[in-house]
């Protein structure tokens, strides 16, 4: 038997390596179908769940913490002027892709993504004496996870409120419309694949509407948690700086105060360095159960098509 000789079958160079540079990101060069084949359907999530969206939320958390510290009563950090507050909130509101690129450039030196955000914010204080004097209060007493866990929660909050629930509502509304339109259209039911008692097309759609409404309520009801209690969850650095201050109440205030001055999340009072993320498991499970309902619907529709109940609408070019 002839032995295999790797040298007999050289690996062909990829177009990218042949050209001497990486291929630019496009739907056909993306590693994931999320940014490839299905990019057009997920565009609304990109500003929320991308690294740019993550940076944006980190800036939001750092600014909210910084502004709150100015009102805490520190001798070294007087309350900020209305103009300074407006400027800081503008950094969040007007955060751009160019700002994200600037943070990535800083990260090349720091080799630390959260520290890069901190330095970028401080760079925006230049030529503003009021803010320059207080620059060292940016990220004061925080551990990186204080910024990260709250940023993740804000990302999920945005995705749920701006994309997931509106998309689910659109499906529910369409199915409800079909349930009403076809309420009197008879359809032969089946059990165990065999013909059974009659029903209506509208009733079958209504079944799914009720299931999806319940699933939607579960998704919407999940409390998105955030903690800001330091490196091991005990406010160690905070208490070293100001032992008499009620840091737990302060942290709760920042986490639960509505946006833009706070984060509009539910305060997590007990944790280690990381927020335990049980709420994420609850949220993702609720989404998964919703997807199961949609899979059931898709399979039922497939069955109805195979039985000749439904027929695909032809579109030019398809």
Predicted regions and their residues:
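Short intrinsically disordered, low-complexity coil segments enriched in acidic
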Residues: 1-3, 73, 265, 269, ...
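A helix-coil-helix interface module used to build multimeric assemblies
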Residues: 2-238, 242-256
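Conserved helix-loop functional segments at active or binding sites
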Residues: 181-185, 218, 225, 260-269, ...
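Active-site-adjacent "gating/activation" loops or surface patches in catalytic cores
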Residues: 247-277
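Glycine-rich anion/phosphate-binding loop at the beta-strand->alpha-helix junction
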Residues: 215, 272-318
């Amino acid at each position: 038997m002839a032995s295999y000789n790797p040298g007999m079958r050289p690996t062909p160079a990829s177009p990218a390596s042949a050209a001497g540079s990486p291929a630019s990101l496009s739907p056909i060069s993306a590693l994931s179908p999320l940014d490839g084949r299905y990019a057009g359907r997920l565009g609304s999530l990109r500003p929320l769940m991308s690294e740019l969206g993550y940076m944006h939320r980190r800036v939001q958390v750092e600014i909210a913490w910084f502004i709150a510290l100015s009102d805490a009563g520190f001798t070294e950090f007087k309350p900020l002027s209305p103009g300074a507050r407006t400027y800081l909130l503008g950094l969040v509101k007007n955060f751009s892709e160019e700002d994200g690129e600037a943070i990535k450039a800083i990260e090349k030196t720091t080799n630390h993504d959260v520290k890069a955000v901190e330095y970028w914010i401080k760079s925006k204080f230049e030529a503003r004496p009021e803010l320059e004097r207080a620059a060292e209060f940016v990220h004061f007493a925080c551990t990186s996870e204080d910024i990260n866990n709250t940023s993740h929660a804000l990302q999920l909050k945005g995705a749920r409120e701006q994309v997931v629930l509106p998309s689910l509502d659109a499906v529910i509304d369409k199915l409800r419309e079909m349930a009403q339109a076809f309420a009197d259209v008879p359809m032969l039911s089946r059990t165990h694949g065999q013909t059974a008692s009659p029903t209506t097309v509208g009733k079958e759609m209504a079944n799914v509407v009720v299931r999806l409404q319940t699933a939607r309520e579960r998704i919407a009801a999940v409390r998105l948690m955030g903690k800001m209690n330091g490196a091991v969850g005990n406010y160690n650095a905070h208490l070293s700086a100001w032992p008499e201050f009620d840091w737990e109440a302060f942290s709760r205030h920042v986490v639960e105060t509505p946006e833009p001055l706070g984060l509009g999340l539910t305060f997590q009072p007990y944790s280690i360095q990381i927020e335990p993320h049980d709420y994420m498991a609850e949220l993702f499970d609720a989404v998964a159960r919703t997807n199961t309902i949609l899979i059931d619907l898709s399979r039922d529709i497939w069955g109805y098509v195979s039985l000749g109940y439904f027929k695909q609408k032809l579109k030019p070019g398809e």
